[in-house]
């Protein structure tokens, strides 16, 4: 039985990096929500409720500095410090205001693409066109109000791909895209997301020519994935496409090869700094609180004083027994974690943060 959800080995290998970068760039709330994934629990063998509560406090006090996300935004801004020049023929003028059919212009798609490259090393561009009868002239084309759209795809949503040699050229012959469609509930207000897979193929026809096909897979009542009827897109002349209108976009080149995301080293250091912060804030919490003590007293004095109330401060008289004394104990500050934080902070600045 074929499995449309099968994931390319390179996808499986790189997915943890992409998810880590997404969490780190999203900020403190996303990182802390992952709990022990990014902040190991001290005394992890202790599964008691008390240790669980202690860990929650340990995580809450920790500070995650959103260095990686800020750096990503700064780099995108630097890339577009000078407005890029887009040149479109009149038939594609809509790309300047609505390139993807959802209101994003080509300029905004380019900005999002740079952001994907920084976080995931790559993204993808996929060109689609509504299923309409091919227009015979420009007037008919305008009446249809059907425009080609450019879809920018996150690397996480392209789960599988393959290529083959055709006429001494390497061409993509398979692309599997994970998609989510929205379905409104019967009440007219609620909404749920439904997962589906769009499969782009390059398949031989009866004459041995390779043509582009599209097939969408949805989950049936029995929980199995079922492919809908294949569609055979055609160009303006009604001819089948001889290639898949899809391309990977990489930080270095546009090949299928995946390399480490540019921001990964900074994200790893950002998380290490977060763990040091948890240890430092823990020491600040405990060592920053003085502990009062009394000596030369017995339990009878303590019980009587507790009954009447023990007050410490200016203009307050605290009766003590003969040879009694009151003092304050405070631990020496632990600066090791603080020094580790400073060291990592300097290294992050060296990386361009």
Indicate where each model-derived feature is located.
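Extended, regular secondary-structure scaffolds
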Residues: 118-254
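Extended, charged amphipathic alpha-helical segments
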Residues: 226-353
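Extended, helix-rich architectural segments
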Residues: 1-158
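Short linear motifs in intrinsically disordered
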Residues: 113-117, 128, 163-166, 199-206, ...
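Alpha-helix capping and helix-coil boundary motifs
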Residues: 102-105, 164, 168, 261
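N-terminal start-of-domain structural block
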Residues: 1-43, 212-255
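Intrinsically disordered, low-complexity segments enriched in small/polar residues
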Residues: 25, 33, 67, 75, ...
């Amino acid at each position: 039985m074929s499995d449309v959800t099968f994931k390319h080995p390179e996808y499986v290998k790189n997915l943890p990096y992409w998810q880590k970068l997404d969490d780190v760039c999203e900020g403190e709330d996303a990182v802390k929500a992952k709990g022990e994934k990014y902040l190991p629990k001290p005394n992890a063998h202790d599964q008691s409720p008390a240790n669980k509560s202690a860990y929650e406090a340990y995580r809450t006090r920790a500070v995650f500095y959103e260095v990686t996300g800020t750096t990503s935004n700064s780099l995108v801004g630097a890339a577009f410090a000078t407005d890029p020049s887009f040149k479109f023929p009149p038939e594609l003028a809509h790309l300047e205001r609505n390139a993807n059919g959802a209101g994003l212009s080509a300029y905004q798609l380019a900005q999002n693409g740079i952001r994907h490259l920084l976080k995931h090393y790559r993204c993808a561009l996929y060109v689609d066109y509504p299923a309409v009868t091919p227009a015979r002239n420009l007037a008919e084309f305008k009446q249809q109000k059907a425009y080609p759209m450019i879809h920018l795809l996150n690397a996480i949503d392209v789960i599988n791909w393959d290529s083959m040699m055709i006429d001494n050229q390497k061409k993509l012959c398979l692309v599997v895209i994970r998609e989510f469609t929205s379905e409104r509930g019967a009440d007219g207000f609620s909404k749920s997301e439904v997962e589906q897979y769009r499969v782009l193929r390059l398949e031989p026809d009866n004459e041995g020519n390779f043509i582009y096909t599209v097939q969408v897979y949805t989950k049936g009542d029995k929980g199995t994935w079922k492919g809908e009827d294949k569609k055979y897109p055609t160009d303006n002349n009604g001819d089948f496409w001889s290639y898949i209108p899809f391309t990977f976009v990489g930080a270095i080149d546009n090949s299928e090869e995946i390399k480490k995301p540019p921001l990964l080293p900074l994200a790893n250091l950002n998380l290490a700094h977060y763990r040091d912060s948890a240890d430092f804030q823990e020491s600040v919490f405990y060592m920053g609180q003085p502990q009062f003590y009394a000596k030369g007293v017995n339990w009878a004095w303590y019980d009587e004083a507790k009954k009447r109330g023990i007050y410490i401060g200016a203009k307050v008289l605290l009766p003590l027994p003969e040879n009694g004394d009151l003092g304050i104990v405070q631990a020496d500050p632990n600066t090791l974690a603080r020094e580790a934080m400073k060291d990592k902070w300097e290294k992050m600045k060296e990386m361009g943060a």
